[in-house]
């Protein structure tokens, strides 16, 4: 059994066998999507979240063990490793406890205490610290020599040694840490010389602000830290000094007299010069780390919602990147997203060629039999939407407004240049907008998630940790939906379980050379795609109209024999099982349970037979803004308006109501009941009905509310 299995099982409240089997599968190279979907019998039906937590905790414990080994080696090299100390380090459970144990042995720059020791003052420090000598000044005379010119200098040196001892005392650090944990205050003050600058005003709420650190939300803490990094604010973390000193005095001072008085001075020095700065640094770092983790959670949750947004599906689309001066870039895409045609229209100021633009669009819609129009939500979006809605088409055409966050990043990227080497960035951007309507997931995987604009303080968090979490989110979403093996780009394929950039490129190259895949088993002919990668990826790849209908389902090829046996027992074909509910009702799942195939897998198989390759995403809905509200001046307090959720943060949700400025629904205005997490009430791109609560024309701020309103 793995050394960490029992601890992980206890911490996560999971079955020990489930944890052990999961670690074995992970260590064997299994991906989280594959393990959660196709190894349910071994994991005890753990979901992706639980498996991810096991993997993360295993990594943390491994790193912690390496740190222990490094510390043991360092202390051993110094010749100070005792059996008792080794045992304490081996059994240590917390990183802070481990570092406290190491602190007395940690190599340091030359300190005041070290200088005092070199001057031979350690015996005097020990005598004073024992607090039994009634006349320490007299004893100090014996140490007056060399650079120690008098009694006071000797005693101060001895106090430096005592202060170091107090600072490194495990119990002292534990008690002071506990005071900070429960009572630390975070304080923010404006730097006076920056107060009146325009850039400082966005931090005005924190010019003179304080609250208990344990209650400080991640967005407030990160806002203060950003203000600090921009030179606007001074931020500090502190606790009650008197409370801390009281605890230290109780620990170290014994009675009254000359020596206890000297120790009292050393206690104050130890706290103010060593312990206090150490704790302030520790809790500043810890609180920011926790705030960053929460911010990354919010970003990952938002990204998941964006990636799993409802797709229009394979329809012919007109993609429009709106603009005023340079016009609107318009592209015609076929049902697979291929670019057929593009041109520019200029219905808006300064050109105002409304009639010419109308003829252009109506002709494109007719010539290319366009079924839907996707309009980017940036500059001139509302005006372009109104323009499109005023046109007459000879067949029904749906119109959608699509988020264009990151489209400009894509249009200038290597990926876009590969796809459209002969088109400029404006055409590429319009294509991206059109494709996002057809299949948001397939298009958004081409863009760095950090460019999509659905996070909070994303530039203030650990960028490596952010990338790791966002990549995990993309992988989870891609595999949850499944990928069309014959149409997917190399970028989309690279996120499929068991693949990656090299194998995904090899699949695309094989497809170009040999034509469309007709069965999953052909994947084994792709260069460098062996049995292990095939086992990991096959069930997440779909082949519509394949010879074997299971190749267009989430049934794993290793389970095909089970399905064939079911069909044989029912006296029908696999196709019949899929088409006929009557045939499926004949199946007794218990008859097919084996050592490796249990009820969880069999239940999943039946669900897939009912609807092979089902898409977990919702159906897309058409949305329209209030036609009477087009800019900030049209708004009035009390108005009830339709809107689209564009971003979700810890403090609320931003909503586009069609006036070129998103409004904010504060968390307290999201519902008639208490809301702890905005994500429990609203989702990205959700259509909502809101009431205008407050308007600030100077700062272009709109406060909205959903309280007392029936959600759409």
Task: Locate each region found by the language model.
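Generic start-of-chain signal for non-secretory N-termini
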Residues: 1-20, 27
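A glycine-rich phosphate-binding loop feature that marks nucleotide/adenosyl-phosphate handling sites
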Residues: 178-185, 320-324, 378-383, 402-409, ...
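Short flexible coil/turn linkers enriched for glycine and charged/polar residues
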Residues: 15-16, 28-29, 95, 109, ...
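Single-stranded RNA-binding regions, centering on S1/OB-family and related RNA-binding modules
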Residues: 543-712
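Long, highly charged, low-complexity intrinsically disordered interaction regions
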Residues: 4, 62-80, 90, 409, ...
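Duplex nucleic acid-engaging cores and interfaces of nucleic-acid transaction enzymes
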Residues: 50-53, 60, 64-74, 78-319, ...
């Amino acid at each position: 059994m793995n050394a960490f299995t029992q601890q992980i099982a206890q911490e996560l409240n999971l079955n020990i066998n489930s944890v052990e089997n999961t670690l074995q599968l992970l260590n064997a190279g299994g991906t989280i999507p594959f393990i959660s979907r196709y190894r349910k019998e071994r994991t005890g039906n753990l979901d992706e979240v639980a498996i991810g937590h096991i993997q993360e905790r295993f990594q943390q414990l491994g790193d912690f063990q390496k740190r222990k080994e490094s510390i043991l080696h360092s202390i051993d090299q110094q010749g100070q490793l005792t059996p008792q100390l080794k045992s304490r380090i081996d059994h240590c459970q917390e990183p802070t406890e481990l570092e406290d144990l190491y602190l007395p042995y940690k190599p340091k720059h030359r300190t005041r205490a070290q200088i005092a020791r070199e001057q031979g003052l350690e015996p005097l420090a020990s005598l004073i610290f024992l607090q039994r000598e009634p006349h320490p000044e007299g004893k100090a005379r014996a140490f007056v020599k060399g650079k120690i010119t008098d009694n006071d200098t000797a005693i101060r040196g001895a106090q430096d040694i005592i202060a170091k001892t107090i600072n490194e005392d495990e119990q002292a650090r534990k008690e002071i840490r506990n005071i900070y944990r429960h009572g630390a205050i975070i304080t923010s003050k404006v730097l006076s010389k920056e107060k009146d600058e325009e850039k400082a005003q966005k931090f005005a709420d924190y010019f003179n602000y304080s609250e208990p650190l344990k209650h400080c939300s991640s967005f407030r803490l990160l806002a203060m830290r950003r203000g600090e990094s921009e030179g606007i604010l001074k931020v500090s973390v502190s606790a009650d000094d008197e409370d801390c000193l009281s605890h230290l005095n109780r620990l170290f001072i014994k009675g009254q007299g000359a020596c206890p008085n000297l120790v009292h001075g050393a206690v104050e020095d130890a706290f103010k010069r060593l312990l206090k700065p150490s704790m302030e640094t520790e809790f500043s770092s810890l609180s920011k780390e926790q705030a960053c983790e929460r911010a990354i959670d919010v970003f990952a949750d938002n990204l998941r919602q964006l990636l799993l947004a409802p797709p229009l599906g394979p329809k012919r689309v007109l993609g429009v990147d709106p603009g005023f001066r340079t016009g609107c870039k318009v592209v015609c895409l076929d049902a697979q997203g291929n670019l057929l045609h593009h041109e520019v229209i200029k219905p808006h100021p300064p050109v105002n060629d409304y009639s010419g633009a109308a003829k252009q669009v109506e002709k494109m819609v007719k010539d290319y039999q366009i079924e839907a129009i996707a309009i980017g939500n940036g500059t001139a979006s509302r005006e372009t939407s109104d323009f499109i809605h005023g046109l007459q088409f000879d067949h029904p055409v749906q119109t959608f407004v699509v988020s264009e966050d990151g489209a400009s990043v894509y249009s200038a990227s290597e990926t876009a240049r590969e796809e459209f080497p002969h088109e400029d960035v404006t055409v590429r951007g319009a294509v991206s907008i059109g494709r996002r309507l057809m299949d948001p997931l397939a298009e958004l995987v081409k863009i760095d998630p950090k460019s999509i604009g659905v996070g909070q303080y994303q530039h203030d968090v650990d960028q490596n940790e952010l990338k790791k979490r966002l990549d995990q989110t993309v992988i989870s979403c891609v595999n949850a939906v499944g990928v069309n093996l014959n149409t997917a780009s190399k970028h989309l394929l690279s996120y499929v379980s068991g693949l990656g950039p090299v194998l995904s490129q090899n699949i695309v190259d094989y497809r170009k050379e040999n034509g469309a895949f007709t069965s999953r088993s052909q994947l084994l002919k792709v260069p460098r795609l062996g049995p292990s990668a095939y086992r990991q990826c096959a069930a997440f790849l779909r082949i519509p109209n394949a010879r074997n209908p299971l190749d267009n389902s989430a049934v794993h090829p290793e389970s095909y024999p089970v399905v064939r046996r079911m069909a044989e027992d029912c006296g029908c074909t696999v196709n019949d099982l899929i088409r006929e509910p009557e045939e499926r009702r004949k199946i007794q799942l218990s008859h097919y349970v084996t050592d490796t195939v249990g009820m969880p897998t069999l239940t999943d198989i039946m669900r897939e037979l009912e609807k092979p390759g089902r898409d977990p995403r919702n159906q897309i809905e058409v949305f329209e803004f209030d036609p009477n509200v087009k800019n900030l001046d049209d708004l009035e307090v009390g108005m009830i308006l339709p809107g689209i959720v564009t971003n979700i943060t810890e403090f609320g949700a931003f909503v586009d109501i069609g006036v070129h400025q998103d409004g904010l629904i504060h968390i307290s205005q999201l519902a008639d009941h208490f809301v702890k997490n905005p994500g429990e009430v609203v989702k990205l791109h959700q259509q909502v009905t809101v009431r205008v609560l407050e308007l600030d024309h100077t700062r272009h701020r709109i406060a909205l509310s959903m309280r007392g309103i029936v959600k759409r």
